[in-house]
Amino acid sequence: MNFNINILGTGGTRPLHNRYLTSVLIEYHGESILFDCGEATQMSLRKQKISWQKIKMICITHLHADHITGLLGIVMLMAQSGDTRKEPLTIIGPIGIKKYLETNIELLRVHKNYQIIYKEIIINKTEPVLYEDKRKRIEYIKLKHSIDCIGYLFIEKDKPGKFDTQKAESLNIPKGPIRKKLQEGYEVILNGRKIVPSEILGEIKKGLKFAYITDTAYFEELSTYIQNFNLVIIESTFKDDLKEEAKKKLHLTAKLAAQITKKAKVYQTGLIHFSERYTLNKDLYELLNEAQQEYPNGNIFLAKDGMKLKANKDKFIIK
């Protein structure tokens, strides 16, 4: 299955020597989608030997520095790589993302040899579906932070089941366009008889659902957007002893993150966006322990810089 999730960074506020700022990249059927682009994201791409030229879309959650300061560098890198990029780059984010980037491009006189397509989200007005093709769709949800902030949902479409050649032949369905339409999930009329895909296709293969959620305070409705998702990468900025600070700063504790995914019956939960105060492994494992105590059957793990998750049937395997 051609579906990988790469963890480029896991920290909040500022990068550390062993922890870059929170950023996640999806590789899906030869194309890449980048979620957030803080300082040093470019370094993570280099370390993990990921081609920036394959990035077709960059989705920014909000206009705080630790989520956008690497964006200009990526745009410049794409332009300076031998003038080979021909595909447009789509950048999605809240109102202001275009002004932020275009102002910097103008001031620094950046030469671009490719088109940037901006899609600025007006929360509660922009339609939830941001992008859709035959394989997938990308939606946004409103989060609760000190400025406009967006969570992203990557939803793979269901796939038709295996084509039963013997059944097709027994129904005298000829090879060619009619079989192709059935394989694509469409009904056909053959010799006056309606044939539905379920007659010759095996069980539908459910598509995978992934969510990227940071930065946000806890709110009840959040779990409704990610019901039964296969994997949710969600901020876990603080341990529970700092829950009041988390509430004040509109962030989550690891325990609250687990409450959200437990309520949503999420299959796998990845914790991310750790406070810079947690520099020791024991601090991070305390975060993990608090989340696991809240959701013991939640398949909860710590996201780590350089981690790669590979889709395997209905779950993601950490490589």
Swiss-Prot record:
Enzyme Commission code: 3.1.26.11
Alphabetized SMART domains for the sequence: Lactamase_B
Annotated Zn(2+) 1 binding sites: H62, H64, H145, D215
Reactions it catalyzes: Endonucleolytic cleavage of RNA, removing extra 3' nucleotides from tRNA precursor, generating 3' termini of tRNAs. A 3'-hydroxy group is left at the tRNA terminus and a 5'-phosphoryl group is left at the trailer molecule
Residues binding Zn(2+) 2: D66, H67, D215, H273
Cofactor mode of binding and number, as noted: Binds 2 Zn(2+) ions.
Keywords: Endonuclease, Hydrolase, Metal-binding, Nuclease, tRNA processing, Zinc
Cofactor: Zn(2+)
Any single Pfam family the record assigns to this protein: Lactamase_B_2
Role of this protein: Zinc phosphodiesterase, which displays some tRNA 3'-processing endonuclease activity. Probably involved in tRNA maturation, by removing a 3'-trailer from precursor tRNA.
HAMAP family: RNase_Z_BN (MF_01818)
Stated name of the protein: Ribonuclease Z
Organism: Borrelia recurrentis (strain A1)
